[in-house]
Amino acid sequence: MARTRNRLDRTPFQTAVTDLSHDGRGVARRDGEGGKVTFISGALPGELVRAEPTARSRHFDEAKTVEVLEASPQRVTPRCPHFGVCAGCVLQHLEESQQIVAKQRVLMDNLERIGHVTPQAVLPALTGDNWGYRRKGRFSVRRVEKKDKTLVGFRELDPRFVADLSICYTVIPQIGEKIPLFAALIEGMDGKRDIPQIEFIAGDDAVALTIRHMQPLSERDRQAWVAFAQEHGFAIFLQPGGVDSVHPLWPQDVPLSFRLPQWEVELAFRPLDFIQVNASLNQKMIAHAVALLEAKPDDRVLDLFCGLGNFTLPLARVVREVVGVEGDAGLVARAKENAQRNGLDNAQFHAADLTQDQRSAPWMRQGFDKLLLDPPRSGALEVLQQLPLKTFDRIVYVSCHPGSLARDAGYLVNDQGFTLVCAGAMDMFPHTAHVESIAVFERR
């Protein structure tokens, strides 16, 4: 006889919320469950809520708030009508000034719990634009036959579903206010079932959409996108396959770039390239990192995971030489072009997979005074274990994941004898639980 899985009891329960998790959910311990931890979406520390169970596991349960019985004084009314359904933002119900406080707390907790390190000083949080800041992103697209409509938006909190967005306030207004127009255009296409996603990216002077399509577009559909682009001021790219298949539909020549006025630098990029999503925070972050590095005119600096040269080229304005290393060969090619375009002949770039053995690479043996790195979520442990770390007087580590930063900080401090001078959060993604941070290490 086949075993049947126990059905989840969704009876709402009342509980006190004591903390905020790293992903922005309230944390509660249910006495009736032996003190088992429950993560509750939409709940804040200090609140008494009624919550409905949504999932159970051996070590913790999950639930969603159905009623706030006693509200936190830090609770605010979310601006977005889709809050609580869309997973794009999970902290809109928390006062903006407290969001970054929570992120600082997540960072410090990770450093202590995972890395077993404590910074000598906590840096003041870095903040930028809180609304309309997101200049790069990806919308999912889904034709829902039962609703007889096309949905365009971010994923819902239940990632099986696409949020049916009417607006998004965190995305730049040129995009966030036009989401229903995207859905209407796709709904009218011959190939409306063949569009799985739309990517958007904005430079200082142009906004580009990349349309992923699983089947060739009909001429009628192509002309519909061209007309849409002309009416609303977009550049349209098509992506029938992998990244290399991206090509312009209209216009044929689209200059995409952003400027860093403090450094007299302009960075050109392509539609699917990585750029920092928050333009105002990015400019502050670069200035912050350069200052924390204490870069001097005679310094030679190594910039790992350099991308388009976001840090490399500003550094080239203030140091003798800077070498950028990046795993994406396309980004390296663009970085070299950017250096040439900006008249910076003291910036070199190399393509290298920094998760693999690079000890014989020529750039590894050049000799540097300082190190700046901005790795992906997985961190930089593999390359840190290969570098001649004792040659660096100072390291500035920009992180997009506090857990991997904490692990790498533990290695630098506890295994390699560095001091964690300071660390602090940076609010690259306001209203989300994403924690961007920066840390400074000094050789003892």
Swiss-Prot record:
Binding site for S-adenosyl-L-methionine: 276, 305, 310, 326, 353, 374
CDD domains from the UniProt entry: AdoMet_MTases
One Pfam family, short name: tRNA_U5-meth_tr
Xref: Gene3D superfamilies: 2.40.50.1070, Nucleic acid-binding proteins (2.40.50.140), Vaccinia Virus protein VP39 (3.40.50.150)
Domain spans labelled TRAM: 5-67
Keywords noted in UniProt: 4Fe-4S, Iron, Iron-sulfur, Metal-binding, Methyltransferase, rRNA processing, S-adenosyl-L-methionine, Transferase
Residues given in the record as [4Fe-4S] cluster binding sites: 80, 86, 89, 168
Active site: 400 (nucleophile)
GO terms of biological process kind: rRNA base methylation
Example GO molecular function: iron ion binding
Record field: catalytic activity: uridine(1939) in 23S rRNA + S-adenosyl-L-methionine = 5-methyluridine(1939) in 23S rRNA + S-adenosyl-L-homocysteine + H(+)
Annotated EC: 2.1.1.190
Family in the record: Belongs to the class I-like SAM-binding methyltransferase superfamily. RNA M5U methyltransferase family. RlmD subfamily.
PANTHER family in UniProt: 23S RRNA (URACIL(1939)-C(5))-METHYLTRANSFERASE RLMD, RNA M5U METHYLTRANSFERASE
Known function: Catalyzes the formation of 5-methyl-uridine at position 1939 (m5U1939) in 23S rRNA.
Name by which UniProt lists this protein: 23S rRNA (uracil(1939)-C(5))-methyltransferase RlmD
Organism for this UniProt entry: Xanthomonas euvesicatoria pv. vesicatoria (strain 85-10)
